[in-house]
């Protein structure tokens, strides 16, 4: 399941609405969707539209009403810590996955976030977070891997965990 807290754009929820519109308006897409879900023997994962303040309550409500309980609930949070409720909600996450791209500003921002969160909330016991992982997104195959290696060394020097998976630029 996904709780889309990235108010006001709610891009994940918007994508699902777009998908549902395509399926509802096209017998071709309706047949594809039916065949897909019949083949995998599962329904589409639930997406709940929320905000950072109400995210945890909305997630609990969703879990309580689902016939099949999700194994994992992902929370898509706003990109700024200044948004209401973000820090409080993040402090209740078991794991945090932070996207980074090969842009100096993005990397510095991610480093500042991870250091601040770790130093002020995790090590003090105020957060229940078990781990924070960075992952590369918007990876352009034409970019030199040296850039990723350089940033990778910087992350390693700070003992930050980086997932091996890199999401390509779409």
Which residues does each PLM region occupy?
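Conserved C-terminal guanine-recognition region of P-loop GTPase G domains, centered on the G4
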Residues: 110-128
């Amino acid at each position: 399941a996904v709780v889309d807290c990235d108010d006001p754009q709610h891009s994940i929820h918007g994508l699902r609405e777009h998908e549902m519109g395509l399926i509802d308006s096209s017998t071709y897409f309706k047949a594809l969707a039916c065949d897909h879900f019949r083949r995998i023997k599962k329904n589409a994962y639930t997406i709940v539209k929320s905000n950072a303040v109400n995210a945890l309550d909305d997630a609990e409500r969703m879990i309580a009403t689902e016939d099949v309980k999700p194994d994992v609930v992902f929370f898509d949070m706003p990109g700024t810590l200044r948004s209401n409720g973000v820090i409080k909600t993040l402090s209740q996450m078991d794991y945090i996955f932070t996207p980074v791209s090969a842009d100096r500003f993005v990397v510095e921002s991610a480093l500042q976030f991870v250091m601040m969160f770790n130093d002020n909330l995790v090590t003090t016991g105020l957060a229940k977070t078990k781990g924070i992982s960075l992952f590369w997104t918007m990876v352009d195959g034409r970019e030199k891997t040296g850039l990723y290696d350089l940033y990778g060394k910087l992350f390693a020097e700070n003992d930050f965990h980086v997932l091996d998976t890199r999401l390509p630029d779409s």
